[in-house]
Amino acid sequence: MQPGQKVLDLCAAPGGKSFSAAFAMEDKGEIVSCDLHENKLKRIQEGAARLGLTSITTSAGDGRVFRPEWAERFDVVLVDAPCSGLGIIRKKPDIRYKKADDLFTLPVIQTALLDNAAKYVAPGGVLVYSTCTILPEENEQVTDAFLAEHSEFCREGFTLPEPVGETEGQLTLWPQSHGTDGFYICRMKRT
């Protein structure tokens, strides 16, 4: 992210991605932090104030519902989608007791979020999809299906610090290999 860009953090709570974006952009530009749960937005506002960040505004709403005023407006759109959380099970062991039905409904929600988020990306802009799970059903299968339906997007490589290094546009981080939580990230560029 660069100073002066417009960024939409579609599933923003608790705000860490928005704060990181603001720092990367030197607090110059516009970051809209959106979340379904209005009560969580107060924490983002408080965090931004505590950090002295003025580029962040908040907006409550369902990321699956189209907002015409945001159409093709953002240089970067972040979708850190609700997921099973299986990548962070060592930190939150109660995850293992979630209903199995969630594993079938989550990809539907994730796909709807991604499809709607795509409408907000300006030509030449970037759409980033991430989850804290390691399940292909919530990760590669969601982004593969999205790209099959959206020819105006393609994966775009990115670089992370070693030991990861260069990627070809998507990556699953594994606790046993990378010393991190389990995590998936896919970067897609709009042509």
Q: What does each model-found stretch correspond to?
A:
Residues 1-191:
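S-adenosylmethionine
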